[in-house]
């Protein structure tokens, strides 16, 4: 068995095992750079699958279709063409949807702001800005709300002042307009109050220097 990275067709002619002879990738009209086990869509380890699609991104779209095993489709979706990624946004597999969100056009991912899976919503929040994130301000997932607090425009931040997560309020204390800082001045979390105090002190110093 050869150990050189080469095309599937060459390895087949070199006498590899049945798993390579029957490989659907090998039957494609275009060659793929692969290696059994370490750079293969059917590798036992996920790393080997991802390595294959990193080396052969053109196979991402072709191998994200439903007839492929889920673990193959999840890795393939990360390399799928952005226009095909739109079709994967409604895939039953949450990991495929999450990868599709990262590649699909922004206008296509808006409905997934209310996806049942928090991982998918996190991926959505990391791509959107401003008013597109308003409906995610009350998301039940803490990570989603933290991302939202860091990406909405500052004039929207007062809408999140009642959040019960101190991490969200820390972001608010750093970003919110100074006119709202007094609302957070008596926050139950010490470091939130410290951030507010630091900003207020700076504001007073700036006024005195003028």
Give residue spans per PLM region.
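Alpha-helical scaffold segments
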Residues: 1-210
């Amino acid at each position: 068995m050869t150990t050189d990275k080469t095309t599937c067709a060459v390895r087949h002619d070199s006498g590899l095992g049945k798993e390579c002879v029957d490989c659907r990738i090998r039957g494609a009209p275009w060659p793929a750079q692969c290696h059994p086990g370490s750079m293969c869509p059917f590798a036992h380890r996920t790393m080997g699958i991802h390595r294959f699609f990193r080396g052969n991104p053109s196979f991402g779209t072709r191998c994200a279709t439903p007839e492929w095993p889920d673990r193959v489709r999840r890795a393939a979706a990360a390399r799928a063409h952005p226009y095909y990624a739109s079709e994967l946004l409604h895939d039953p597999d949450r990991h495929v949807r999450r990868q599709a969100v990262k590649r699909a056009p922004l206008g296509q991912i808006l409905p997934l702001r209310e996806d049942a899976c928090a991982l998918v919503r996190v991926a959505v929040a990391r791509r959107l800005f401003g008013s597109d994130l308003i409906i995610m301000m009350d998301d039940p997932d803490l990570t989603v709300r933290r991302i939202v607090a860091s990406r909405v425009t500052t004039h929207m931040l007062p809408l999140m002042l009642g959040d019960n997560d101190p991490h969200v309020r820390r972001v608010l204390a750093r970003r919110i307009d100074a006119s709202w800082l007094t609302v957070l001045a008596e926050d139950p979390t010490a470091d939130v109050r410290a951030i507010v105090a630091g900003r207020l002190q700076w504001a007073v110093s700036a006024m005195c220097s003028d």
